[in-house]
């Protein structure tokens, strides 16, 4: 089970677009590869309390594979078995980073935190970690040109569906 966290300064609409993009991408990927589809959901303060509780229970039972939420809403979540936390936006301070990383490895379990860091953000991110004495705990995984070429047709299909969805909503 994975949790993808968007920076709370970003709009709910941006997080919704991310959820739709992930859904459309995984549908295209699943069709092409005969893989079972992932169950991806958006956990938001826009949901009623009962809906949020139901969604968290489904995540705990393994019925939801990916949960997308903001920093702010993630603060109230205590899930015991989150294998990966993916920070879609780079945390701006160490407290937020520690909070995000803390969503994994609850109760002594193993978990990984992934931060998607753009080239222009690397210096700030490394400096923040270094100042906190945490840089040695970080592994860098550089994505090489062409690594995602096999996924590109599915991504383009997902983007086209996303554009179509948002043009219909206007």
Spans of model-derived segments:
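Conserved small/polar residues in nucleotide/adenosyl-binding loops
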Residues: 1-8
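Conserved two-lobed SF2 helicase motor
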Residues: 56-74
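SF2 helicase motor core recognition
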Residues: 68-85, 100-109
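Conserved beta-strand segments of the P-loop GTPase G domain that flank and frequently precede/overlap
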Residues: 8-10, 43-44, 86-89, 115-117
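Residue-level preference for the first positions of well-ordered beta-strands
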Residues: 6, 65-66, 112
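Conserved helicase motor
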Residues: 9-13, 40-53, 70-74
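Arginine-glycine-biased low-complexity disordered regions
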Residues: 2, 13-39, 54-57, 61, ...
């Amino acid at each position: 089970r994975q949790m993808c966290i968007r920076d709370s300064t970003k709009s709910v609409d941006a997080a919704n677009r991310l959820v739709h993009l992930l859904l459309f991408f995984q549908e295209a990927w699943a069709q092409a590869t005969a893989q079972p589809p992932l169950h991806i959901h958006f956990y938001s303060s826009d949901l009623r309390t009962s809906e949020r509780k139901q969604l968290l229970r489904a995540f705990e039972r393994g019925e939801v594979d990916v949960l997308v939420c903001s920093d702010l809403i993630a603060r109230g979540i205590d899930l015991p078995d989150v294998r990966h936390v993916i920070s879609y936006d780079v945390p701006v301070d160490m407290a937020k980073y520690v909070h995000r990383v803390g969503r994994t490895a609850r109760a002594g379990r193993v978990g990984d935190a992934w931060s998607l860091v753009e080239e222009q953000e690397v210096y700030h991110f490394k400096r923040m970690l270094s100042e906190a004495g945490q840089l040695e705990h970080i592994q860098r995984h550089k994505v090489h040109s062409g690594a995602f070429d096999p996924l590109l047709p599915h991504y383009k299909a997902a983007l086209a569906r996303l554009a179509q969805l948002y043009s219909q909503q206007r």
